[in-house]
Each structure stands twice: as C-alpha cells, then as structure tokens.
C-alpha cells in the first residue's frame, strides 16, 4: 500500500458491488449530514435508502461505481454516468462522490475523482459536468482544486449549481 504526503495509507479503489450497498448508504448519509449542516435537512439510514443505492450501483454500463477501501474498511465511493442534462448528450457526469467524514482530507476523494475522470475519458467524453449545492463551499473548493469550473448552469430555484471539467487536457 502506498502512502500520501501526510504518510496516510492510500486507498484501494475497486468496482462497487451489491455487497457494498449498506456501506455506501452509510457513507452517503454520514457525509451528507456532516457536509450539508445548515444547508439541507439531515438524512436517515433507512432500508429504502439502501435499496436505492443497490438499484443505482447495479445499473449496467455506461453507469459505473467504485469504492475506496482503507484499513480494511469502505471509506468512500464515486459514480459516473452519461449526463442527465439535456444540454448535450455527449457530456459525462460525475453522479456522486462521497467520503466518510472521518477520512476527509486524506486524499481519498482525490483518488476517487481521478478514477472517475479517467474512465470518463476512456468512455470518449470530452467534458463532464456535476451538480452541487450553491452554498456548499467545502465541496466547491474540492471541485475547483481539481480543475472544475462553474459554467453558469443552475437548477432547483438556484439551490444547485453546475460545474464543468474539460477532459481533453
């Protein structure tokens, strides 16, 4: 196992499977409730949420999901898909990325994002988009540090903003 600049173990990233569903749902809820405090209502870990994640991660290609493991535990996940935006069907989309809050700032999100972008490129997309909350500053800093730029897209009465990433460079 390699280590990052803070001497933290780097995660192992692998394709997500149905056995990961409950951990993906837990990470989703934990990261939502920690990251979106004051921005969105808290979420609860429910059977319905686990079932939703099982449906999402078993959708066939071109939807893809990966998980990150560190210290023998699932600590994050990421998914890609064709863009749901009607602006351009040739766009890829970063569907969701989440890391367990206890593992933030350890490079796990960057590692997951690198895998997602690599596969979007390999799938032939020249650009990708993502949506995030307009006032989610921590997430926006993360995306901007990775080369994403606001492109002016808004939805949900301005509560969400769209970022775009050029995959050609």
Tell where the protein language model's regions lie, with residue ranges.
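Acetyl-CoA-dependent GNAT
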Residues: 3, 11, 15-21, 25-102, ...
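Structural motif
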Residues: 27, 123, 145-146
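Active-site acidic-Proline motif in GNAT/NAT acetyltransferases
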Residues: 100-102, 106, 134-135
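Conserved GNAT acetyl-CoA-binding A-motif
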Residues: 120-132
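Conserved beta-strand-loop-alpha-helix junction that forms the acyl-donor binding cleft
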Residues: 130-139, 156-159
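Conserved acetyl-CoA-binding loop of GNAT-fold acetyltransferases
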Residues: 144-153
